[in-house]
Amino acid sequence: MNSLSLVFWSILAVVGLLLFIKFKPPTIASLLLSKDEAKEISIQFIKEFVGIDVENWDFYSVYWYDHDTVNKLHHLGILKKNRKVLYDVGLVESWRVRFVHQNQSFVVGVNANREITFFYADVPKKTLSGKFEQVSPETLKQRLMASPDGLWSRANMTGTGKKEEDFREVSTYWYIAEAGDIRLKVTVELQGGRISYIGTEQEILTDQMSKVIRDEQVESTFGVSGMLGSALAMILAILILVFMDVQTSIIFSLVLGLLIIICQSLTLKEDIQLTIVNAYDARMSVKTVSLLGILSTLLTGLLTGFVVFICSLAGNALAGDFGWKTFEQPIVQIFYGIGAGLISLGVTSLLFNLLEKKQYLRISPELSNRTVFLSGFTFRQGLNMSIQSSIGEEVIYRLLMIPVIWWMSGNILISIIVSSFLWAVMHQVTGYDPRWIRWLHLFIFGCFLGVLFIKFGFICVLVAHFIHNLVLVCMPLWQFKLQKHMHHDQPKHTSL
């Protein structure tokens, strides 16, 4: 590595970073309520409509949005048109919070308009018994309304019903709210005048839904291919280690496997909170749910770490048998890897920006990076995501697959192309329309990483992939946190 190449690569890296900052994927100003606001609104709602004070109960919360509806609108090409509607009715920019106490819990959905859009009481039936004011459907709607543009201001009563459950009468009110291309069927259940359930069923008013379903099936199919690829890679790695006369060092593979396990534990707290909010059952204690979350995280880390360990062991052995220097000159590899990651970010951002301006590509922030910078996402989660994806994918698709395909074909170009194609199609390209542009970009990026692997070694592509993911994931988060700190006392604005 001479001084000229050092300077040239450094300049390209700086230019790449500047291009990314200037042309990075679009974001939308957040109107999400603070966690404390969502908690207070939920406490007051439960006190008013259920008659129970949950202020001192254990509290858990996560950011929530309706990914399924947003994804369908994106593929129909009408997401931008309905973006404000999604916000108004709480299908984006919402909180899901849960209060837990003595095997009882309440789940509440709160949108940015300070309205309750979801509620479920997971408590004994006798808790909801006793005298309580029974209100009419219209009166209930007026009491739940908190904004002239929100869900309840758009809701129109369509019917009522009554049934008996456990010898108690349950009243049901049905409403329909329409806005833009979205129709919401709202159901409210009351026991003894107390609200026990509020739920919505979303419907998109279109005759193109069959096309969207086919597109989603394509995404799911390619997503499954990633898991199958990992399983086949591990089987192939075991066969190489058992039947081929290869020698390798175990230390680096152990380090990679242990790093995966450690990274998995970085987000343990967030994973447990997500599990409690979305899947807690009053028949189980919070400690039990937490323990199950810990065991699940550890098991996932062990399984993923084992796959990485076996595949890296086989890939390193095969590459060493070919005389490839995959781990030599680590400082040089790290330098070129950092530069390559920044260069790829800049080129990608510039290219996507030009394609969007020419209307050849449509990127939806709600799907591509929306949840990255909103409340609840932490740097630890970004670090975990970046490390795990870079190690797991590079071990399988570069360190193992390129030597294997080269051994089978005898052609290094074929090995780079095939491994890059398989790596590209295993990605779910949610948020990009048409999808093939994103897949083509991933294929080209994969070929770039393949060339770096052959030219410099495995550490280079590992660092390049890590830097690319870390900056892409965490820069919006850092900007959001900085803007939130700088404008803490100023009113929020939106570009919806």
UniProtKB/Swiss-Prot annotation:
**How is this protein positioned relative to the membrane?**
Multi-pass membrane protein
Q: Name one GO molecular function term.
A: endopeptidase activity
- UniProt keyword annotations, A-Z: Antibiotic biosynthesis, Bacteriocin biosynthesis, Membrane, Transmembrane, Transmembrane helix
Subcellular location(s): the record lists: Membrane
How is loss of this gene reflected in the phenotype of the organism? When the skfA-skfB-skfC-skfE-skfF-skfG-skfH operon is deleted, increased rate of spore formation; a double operon deletion (sdpA-sdpC plus skfA-skfH) makes spores even faster.
- Spell out where the chain crosses the membrane: 1-21, 224-244, 248-268, 291-311, 331-351, 399-419, 443-463
- One GO CC term of this entry? membrane
Q: What is this protein called?
A: Sporulation-killing factor biosynthesis protein SkfC
UniProt lineage: Bacteria, Bacillati, Bacillota, Bacilli, Bacillales
